């Protein structure tokens, strides 16, 4: 795990130097971002600067459960929100993302928190990180790795 975090840290420092462009900017304005993020999510948000975007949206979490030799797949609807920060306004940029959400787990509401580091090329964001699920009384239900791929559809000139 330490090696993965080291690679992500090096990538975040190196990516802004890979490409410089005066013709591309992330700009400011509204966007939607369909995304695979431990499930399927639709983010609706606002790019408040070329470096920061806020988003909220519905999603469908995917759970893969293993008990002995039995594997089951479950889905759960979820509402979430978060912030994504870019390291530059170039076509290539490093990206850090934090999202938190609520979903129904059996009879009670549970929370999901995720922290992702990665890269962005123009409107395509991709990365990996960690997620953790909490139940009632802050009981840890599960945790693990997370991979994300999303595409920003922007409703403003950039």
Where are these predicted regions, by residue range?
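Sec-dependent N-terminal signal peptides
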Residues: 4-15
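A short local loop/turn or secondary-structure capping micro-motif enriched for an aromatic residue
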Residues: 63-65, 134-137
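Residues that define the transmembrane beta-barrel architecture of outer-membrane proteins
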Residues: 28-30, 36-40, 62, 71-79, ...
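Positively charged n-region of N-terminal signal peptides that target proteins for export
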Residues: 1-4, 19-20
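Repeated loop/turn-to-beta-strand initiation elements of outer-membrane beta-barrel proteins
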Residues: 51-56, 89-94, 123-128, 155-158
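Residues on the lipid-exposed face of transmembrane beta-strands in outer-membrane beta-barrel proteins
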Residues: 40-46, 58-60, 77-85, 98, ...
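Short glycine/proline- and aromatic-enriched beta-strand/turn motifs that initiate or cap beta-hairpins
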Residues: 19-63, 68, 148-150, 154-158
